[in-house]
Amino acid sequence: DVLLLDEPTNHLDLDTIIFLENYLKSFEGTILCISHDRDFLDTFCSHILHFESNHLVMYTGNYSDYERLRAERIKNEKANRRREEASLAHMQDFVERFRYKASKAKQAQSMLKAIDRLKLTAVTQEESPYHIKFADPERTVDIIADLKELDCGYSENDIILKKVNLMLIAGDRIGLLGRNGQGKSTLIKTLCSVLKPVHGTVTLGKGIKIGYFAQHELDQLSGQMSALDHLRAIDHNAKEKDLRTFLGSFSFSGDKATQKVEDMSGGEQARLALAIVAYQKPNLLLLDEPTNHLDLDMREALSLALSTYKGALILVSHDRHLLEAIADKLWLIDDGNVSEFNGDLNDYQEFLNKKNREYKEKLNEKI
């Protein structure tokens, strides 16, 4: 009768997310779902519950409706607050001028009580706590990476990708598509030398500085060190004030900057790992599922930061909103091959549907 879902799309590939969406759309019971995937919420939600200042506020509609309605509410609250502030200022001025004048003292006291009774409307916090930015990287060569006859995998007997021949050009913003287990992470690891090519070559352009983020990189964070300690380890000569200012843009302000990693949530650790990548000013970003564990505000801030990033990037993500906002080229990994995908995410969904139909037909033939 009731489905309680807590981040159900984490670690699912796009094919499985679409399957889950279709199931939830046809589900006749009640669904209470926590998710940071806005496109996912748009498909089946009829109401959004938002935690605001220790209260729950209900909005009718899906996530896109919620964004619009909340923006309208904020606008109206701001207008009301300006009117109330003007009224308060006028009343306060009256009190200051006449509170000690006998003929007006009683009126002034009444005005003071009115001021105490008047409660300012609490305007919803529309400002994101995150204001992240990837610094402009140093200008580099036109060919960032040249992949020739590349076989990727873990050994001669465990080759995942075969005969990859692709080139990454300065300014490229690549979204990697493919089902889980097809080799997206394997390709990323090979590009950043975590894995050696089984055969073939990966040639990086001169002066290329890679910024690599993956979920397993969180394990490389030292539990006893703070966010501030991690940046100090990278840049011994930096002033603490500058490091704190930078960390503040990732919402590590005040005591948060000195909190030990072992006491951080998964989302905070992911933010710190991204901060470390951003601080090093890479000219090639390799991002493997960067939005896992991130809340919607941080996802939006990351999307904005990546949209203005001037280096090249390759992104693995099942967050369609992020892919559509960032990637201007798509590479498809399927059945051990990597190739450019001519189409958008809607075309990719149709590609997946076609693959599923073909798979079912083969099963029926066997039966």
Residue ranges with predicted function:
Residues 1-81, 137-367:
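ABC ATP-binding cassette signature C-motif
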